[in-house]
Amino acid sequence: NDFCGCGSGKKYKTCCLRTPIELRTTWSVASIRERNLAFCKFIRDVLGISKGKTWKQIRQELSNEQIVDIYKFYSILWPRETDIYSLLPKSDGRFRGLYTGILDVRSIHKNAIPVATMFDEFLIETPIINPNNLKPEFSPITSPNQYKYQALKDILFMLQLEPYINYGHINLIPDPSEFDLELKKAMIDMSYQRRHSIEIKNTEDHKFYLQTMIGDLLNTTALMPLEVRIKILVNAFKLDKDQVIEIINEFDNDIQKSSLALLQPSSSGKDGLFMQYCMGPNYEMTLLISQVTGSVIVTDSGLRWQELMNAQHRTHGLTTYPWNKMLNAINVIPQDDQFLEKFLKTQGKISKSRELLKKVDQMILN
C-alpha cells in the first residue's frame, strides 16, 4: 500500500508493480509531476495565495522580487544537466496522448484539457521559459520588469492545470531539447529545411494569434490614458480609429472579468514587455516525444494538422489510410463535465468511448 517511488502519487500496487524496470521512470530523483506540484506550491506561497490573496490583488501587487523568486525556483527545479529521458514516461502500454498546439491559458481549456479524460495519461508541453537557457539580458531573473505580464500568464497556466497534474491526468513536460543542445540544433536545422521546402498557412491559427495579440495589448495597457491606448492599437494592427475605440470600450466594460489585465502601471522602460506566443512541441519534437513515450498525437491546430498530413507516406503520389473509414466514424466524443469541474473521470458512456479509443489504438499498433 506504499506510494510508488516513481512520484505518480499512486499506490505501488496500482502503478509500477507490473511495469518492467526498464519501462519505469526513474525513482532516484523527483518526478516531473512532483516538480510541477512543487512549482505550483511555491507560486502560491510567494504570491500569498495560500494566505487568501485574491487574483485581483496579485495583478495589482505583482512585484519584480516575486517574479525573480518564481523563475529562479523554476531554474533550480530544471537545471541544464537534467536527465530528461529518465523522467519522461516510456512506451509501457498505457494509453497516452501528446498534445501539440497553442500553449496559452486562454485556449488550453477549449480542447486540450477536455480530451485528456480519454487517456490514461495526457502530456502537454510547458510554456514556462527556463532562465537557464537565456542570456541575462533576456532572463526574467535579471530583467523581471519585462516579464510582469508574461509571468501572469505563466502563473495562471500553472495554477489552472495544477489539479489535473495532482490527480495524474495531465503531465506537464518540458521540451527535451532544453537539456540536449545537439538535439536542439538538429531540431532547428530540420525545421528550417522543412519550412523552406513547403510553406503552410492556416487562417484559423492566424485569427487566434491576432485576437491574442490584441488581447495582450489591451491587458497590458489597461491603466494607460485612452489616447495612448488608441494610438498603440492603431499603429500595431493598422486598424481604423473608430474600430479601436469600440474594442477598447468593450474591453473596459468587462475589465474585471479579464483575468490577465495588468492592474498596475507598466514601467518596463525602453525594452517594453516580453510576450510569448508559443505552439509546442514543434513538428519534429512532437514525433520524437510521441515515439519515446508511446503517445497518440492530439492537436487542435490547423497548422500542425497540415504539417502532419503533408508528411504522410505516399504511394504513387497518393496517401492511403488503412483505418480512414473507421477513424472518420469516431468524429465526436462526449464531454466529461465531471472531469472539468471536479477533476475526476466519469464512467458510464464516457468510459465506453475511452475503451473504444484504447481498442482502436491497440488494433492499429498490432
Language-model-derived ranges and their functions:
Residues 1-366:
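Acidic/negatively charged segments and metal-coordination signatures
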